[in-house]
Amino acid sequence: MAKPLTITSSHSHFSLAWRAYFEMTKPKVVALMLLTVLVGMCLAVPTAVPVQPLIAGMFGIALMAGSAAALNHLIDRRIDGMMARTYNRPLPKGRVSAKRALIFAASIGGLGFVVLYVLVNPLTAWLTFASLIGYALVYTAYLKRATSQNIVIGGLAGAMPPLLGWTAVTNQFHGHALLLVIIIFTWTPPHFWALAIHRRAEYAKVDIPMLPVTHGVEFTKTCILLYTVLLAIACLLPVLVGMCGPMYFVCSSLLSSVFIYKAWQLKYRDHDGLAMQVFRFSIYHLMLLFMALLIDHYLWS
């Protein structure tokens, strides 16, 4: 009777460990990021994306993005344990040790780099590596604790995925790919500032100088509103250069109008929970916008 119990116990331990490591990769964030990678790939070519860069590119970029997320967990483990939103993460709870987290991040990051370098192209491998360093080290380890403009400057690393998808297929830069980067770069501040308003007290408690902590909630609301207007303009750039057609134009205009309206509400008609509503809508905004880009591309082409 002891043997089956031992096997069951081992299986249960493995399952819990696997879930902890998987959680460290921030799968929901990576999934949204991979959508923007896929759109970058598809917009780079007029027909179907070649199979090898599609599969190897998505796999390699996903591994390196997961590595960056795991490093973020590792670096932020102290403050994560003090914040209600993050105290249940694997490192603060002791489900994964710091040493094992580092080994895990290095392993999947290294594997992802090799996959991209060998099976895709060196340009994409190095760009993805630069994004990993930008997010995990420049943003998480330095900017996040150094300046209230942390998310503005550090947002560039998180805006790179469409370019990575583009270079994975073409092995070269293109202005159209940079327009997609601009969209995500402009989207990032209002997305995170809305969350920062909701979690202002927690960020202040752990000495993270998010904009609502250093400049106040009202100033942050104004910045969110201004950035949603800038984002609406950025979202029209693909139309202005002939990259997209009427279907994307209509979807983009509708999504931007709703985002601006919600930001206006946050500034002038705020109520409990509205900041989190803006935060959640921003996720749907980006997801639906890039889906519209993808659908329009095949309709327009």
UniProtKB/Swiss-Prot annotation:
Origin: domain of life: Bacteria
Transmembrane segment boundaries: 29-49, 51-71, 101-121, 123-143, 150-170, 177-197, 223-243, 244-264, 281-301
Main localization, broad class: membrane
Any single GO CC term annotated in Swiss-Prot or TrEMBL for this entry: plasma membrane
Alphabetized UniProt keyword annotations: Cell inner membrane, Cell membrane, Heme biosynthesis, Membrane, Transferase, Transmembrane, Transmembrane helix
Entry protein name: Protoheme IX farnesyltransferase 2
UniProt GO molecular function: protoheme IX farnesyltransferase activity
Classification via InterPro entries: Protohaem_IX_farnesylTrfase (IPR006369), UbiA_prenyltransferase (IPR000537), UbiA_prenylTrfase_CS (IPR030470), UbiA_sf (IPR044878)
Enzyme Commission number(s) of this protein: 2.5.1.141
Functional pathway: Porphyrin-containing compound metabolism; heme O biosynthesis; heme O from protoheme: step 1/1
Catalytic activity: heme b + (2E,6E)-farnesyl diphosphate + H2O = Fe(II)-heme o + diphosphate
Pfam families, A to Z: UbiA
Class of this enzyme: transferase
Bilayer disposition of the protein: Multi-pass membrane protein
Miscellaneous field: Carbon 2 of the heme B porphyrin ring is defined according to the Fischer nomenclature.
Organism expressing this protein natively: Shewanella sp. (strain W3-18-1)
Similarity section: Belongs to the UbiA prenyltransferase family. Protoheme IX farnesyltransferase subfamily.
GO term, biological process aspect, one: heme O biosynthetic process
Localization per Swiss-Prot or TrEMBL: Cell inner membrane
PANTHER family, per database record: 4-HYDROXYBENZOATE SOLANESYLTRANSFERASE, PROTOHEME IX FARNESYLTRANSFERASE, MITOCHONDRIAL
Primary role: Converts heme B (protoheme IX) to heme O by substitution of the vinyl group on carbon 2 of heme B porphyrin ring with a hydroxyethyl farnesyl side group.
